[in-house]
Structures are given as structure tokens and as C-alpha cells.
Regions:
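PLP-dependent aminotransferase-class I/II
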Residues: 98-124
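Conserved core of the PLP fold type I
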Residues: 51-72, 101, 105-110
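Short polar catalytic/cofactor-binding loops
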Residues: 7-11
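Conserved PLP-anchoring active-site segment centered on the Schiff-base-forming lysine
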Residues: 70-88
Length: 124
């Protein structure tokens, strides 16, 4: 299977077959169907968090940016490296979903470092 992108190529045959099986019959909507409830239960079990709220997203960009939106209020800033995935691959989706902004910080090897973050937070 090829997972470089969730929206640039065809799905593997096994995925398409599973979609066809899931498409049989009728099911409740908005996450109340048996398949979604089963997935939620399995994720809660996997993470040993039986009370965890689980939300499924159609793409990696949606999952990443919605998660950031839960953490980042509109007046806040997302600190990241200039080569971070959210900077390089998510385009303006983080700003769109959070209403905030990204601030690129350069550390050693373009990795976000505690020193770079401290300087940004202190305005130095």
C-alpha cells in the first residue's frame, strides 16, 4: 500500500472492497452506525481510554488541523519549524481552521528547540 498522500492516488483494492462491504444495507447517520461505533470502541481500547471522545476525519490535513483548532484559540500562535509538516504540507489549513497564525522558528537543523521557543515567548 502507498500512503504518501491520502488524496493523490487510488485506494488499495482491499480498501475499496471494504468500502463496498460497508455500503451494503442501511445504517444510522452521523457516527451512530455499527461500523463507526466499532472503530471508536477499538480506538478507545487501543489507547486504554474507554471514555475518550473519538472523531474520525476524511483526510490527514483535516485531522491535523482540526486537532490544532481544538488546542489553539483564534488569538493564539502555532509555533513550528519552517520545515514542519504543518508548514510544508498543510498549506493554509491550520490558519483557516484555527483562525490563528503560524510563527516559524528556526533552531538547530531547522528543528524547534526549547531555546528558540523561549526566545519567541519572551519576545527576545
Amino acid at each position: 500500500m502507498f500512503f504518501a498522500s491520502d488524496n493523490q492516488g487510488p485506494v488499495p483494492e482491499a480498501v475499496l472492497e471494504a468500502l463496498c462491504v460497508a455500503n451494503q444495507g442501511y445504517a444510522a447517520s452521523y457516527g451512530a452506525d455499527a461500523i463507526t461505533l466499532d472503530v471508536v470502541s477499538k480506538i478507545q481500547t487501543l489507547f486504554e481510554a474507554p471514555d475518550a471522545a473519538v472523531y474520525l476525519a476524511a483526510t490527514g490535513t483535516a485531522a491535523n488541523t482540526l486537532a490544532l483548532a481544538c488546542l489553539c484559540p483564534p488569538w493564539a500562535t502555532i509555533y513550528c519549524s519552517p520545515v514542519a509538516h504543518i508548514q510544508e504540507d498543510e498549506c493554509n489549513a491550520p490558519e483557516f481552521f484555527t483562525g490563528g497564525a503560524k510563527l516559524n522558528l528556526v533552531g538547530s537543523y531547522d528543528k524547534l528547540t526549547p531555546d528558540a521557543l523561549e526566545q519567541a515567548l519572551l519576545g527576545t
